[in-house]
Amino acid sequence: MPLEVDELRKMDLKQLKERLNELEMQLLKLRVESRMGTLKNTASIKNTRKDIARILTVIGEKSKKEAKK
């Protein structure tokens, strides 16, 4: 299930970075499964990459907002 940007914006930076770490580990596992041929849903790699991009976008927004203060 894709992450909602509104939910991500409500999180603080620490939570976002923790979630980012989780997704990066998940992506690594999915890639290994893909190479081994045991991955059934190949779209999950694409969805995980998009979730990572969403989190990085929100982290960038929050960083810019804090820099302006």
From Swiss-Prot:
What Gene3D superfamilies does the entry give? 1.10.287.310
User: What cellular component terms from Gene Ontology apply here?
Assistant: ribonucleoprotein complex; ribosome
Q: Which keywords does UniProt give here?
A: Ribonucleoprotein, Ribosomal protein
On whether Ribonucleoprotein is a keyword of this UniProt record, the answer is: yes
What's the superkingdom here?
Archaea
Q: Which organism is it from?
A: Sulfolobus acidocaldarius (strain ATCC 33909 / DSM 639 / JCM 8929 / NBRC 15157 / NCIMB 11770)
Q: Which residues form a coiled coil?
A: none
Keyword Ribonucleoprotein in annotation:
yes
At the highest ranks, the source species' classification is: Archaea, Thermoproteota, Thermoprotei, Sulfolobales, Sulfolobaceae
> Could you give a GO molecular-function term held by this entry?
structural constituent of ribosome
Q: What name does the UniProt record give this protein?
A: Large ribosomal subunit protein uL29
The entry assigns this protein to a family as follows: Belongs to the universal ribosomal protein uL29 family.
